[in-house]
Amino acid sequence: MKVPRVIIAGTNSGVGKTTTTLAVISALKNKGLKVKPYKVGPDYIDPQFHSLLAGATSDNLDLWMIPRERIFQLLADASTSFNISVIEGVMGLLDGFGSTDEGSTLDLARITGTPIILVIDGYGLSGSAAAIVKGFKDFSGDLLAGVIVTRVSGERHYDLIKKAIEDNTNVRVLGYIEKNDEVRLESRHLGLVQASELNSFSDYIERLSKVTHINVDGIIEIARASRDLDPKFSPLLSRVGYAKIAVAYDSAFDFYYEENFRVLRNLGAELVFFSPLNNEIPPEDTDGLYIGGGYPEVFAKKLAYAVDARENIAKLIKKGVPTLAECGGYMYLTRTIVGQDGIEYPGVGIVPAKTFLTDKLILGYREIVSKTSNMLLRHGETARGHEFHRSTIQFQDKVDHPFVLKYKDRFEEDGYYSNNVVASYVHIHFLSNIAIPKRFVEECIRYSKKREIS
């Protein structure tokens, strides 16, 4: 199966991968191509930018959370509706688990036969750029098909870098992005700001286009040389019945995996999005609640003033609506949240705890082992996901945590569970254990039937 595709990888984090990926997507769209974006790894923020620009959801390709056959399936899905796929890498090209390249962008490129375009930072470089590219070429071989240079001072500077690389490495240099602070994406305590928070994303893309000078035809040629895919298709899951699941989605809650939404829909769920931040309430006939991660600590004051949203969510949960809350959603369900301003604000009040920020970033892959048989997992069953926060939850009542999280060197209890609520700091990827979304939808269907009878 022909699926033209290319990976935009970096020498390291902060080199301009996301900016370059957006520049490439924009240039391909301007050629009239339909672009399918992807992100290597567990990131929730970069895909928002991809999706907004491409007009198509950006899927995560994560070799640790997602079984390999599903990775091939996700890539093959692009063959029917898109002309080309652009995959943004994660961290540096070879950065994987520990000191190995397992799970890295290069690992994904090898497994899927996808050519790599390497992004290097040209600031303060000329001939030395060749040594950088040669080193990466030694590790990646023929998969390294091109280079794009960021933070270039002008055409003459670019010509020096281009000649040095092409004369010494036989790797094509496909263009550059000028050094310009106006196209640098801002950051906050958990990474880049969200796409929804840029004042005008279209203006940003226009500014980026003006300082981007890339060989689009060369990128298309490289993408078309990708190895053919031979995915083993199997249905993600067949429909189990209808349920209406209300999903909290706004600037405070938008750390979700698009693949999770797709699986829920395949099972028969109708997803209805609402904004707690804007004091929107879930529909009265809601059969389930899904409250994902995000930045409730940044918007704690506004969430506190959104009284209708908080009270209606609490009311639905107390009525027995099956509820899945992850990270920021877990924080929101607590009694109080200490915001970034240090002030304590009311949360939904379901979880008997207080949330506050710390200076410590907790980040990484997690394997969940269930200590209980609950709505999502049976005792001893596992799932995989990602943890990403600077907050901690301090329980005010004694609770039995439903999960044990496996770290590299230790185990730690996590989460909150009641009859109809499962909450955890971990963003679970449903493709790591497809029993989870199936059970969630089935619980929602059971609740729907009980609600209709009453």
Swiss-Prot record:
Pfam families: CbiA, GATase_3
Annotated PROSITE patterns: GATASE_COBBQ
GO biological process, one term: cobalamin biosynthetic process
Catalytic activity field: cob(II)yrinate + 2 L-glutamine + 2 ATP + 2 H2O = cob(II)yrinate a,c diamide + 2 L-glutamate + 2 ADP + 2 phosphate + 2 H(+)
Swiss-Prot/TrEMBL domain comment: Comprises of two domains. The C-terminal domain contains the binding site for glutamine and catalyzes the hydrolysis of this substrate to glutamate and ammonia. The N-terminal domain is anticipated to bind ATP and cobyrinate and catalyzes the ultimate synthesis of the diamide product. The ammonia produced via the glutaminase domain is probably translocated to the adjacent domain via a molecular tunnel, where it reacts with an activated intermediate.
Note: The a and c carboxylates of cobyrinate are activated for nucleophilic attack via formation of a phosphorylated intermediate by ATP. CbiA catalyzes first the amidation of the c-carboxylate, and then that of the a-carboxylate.
Stated name of the protein: Cobyrinate a,c-diamide synthase
Source organism of the structure: Thermoplasma volcanium (strain ATCC 51530 / DSM 4299 / JCM 9571 / NBRC 15438 / GSS1)
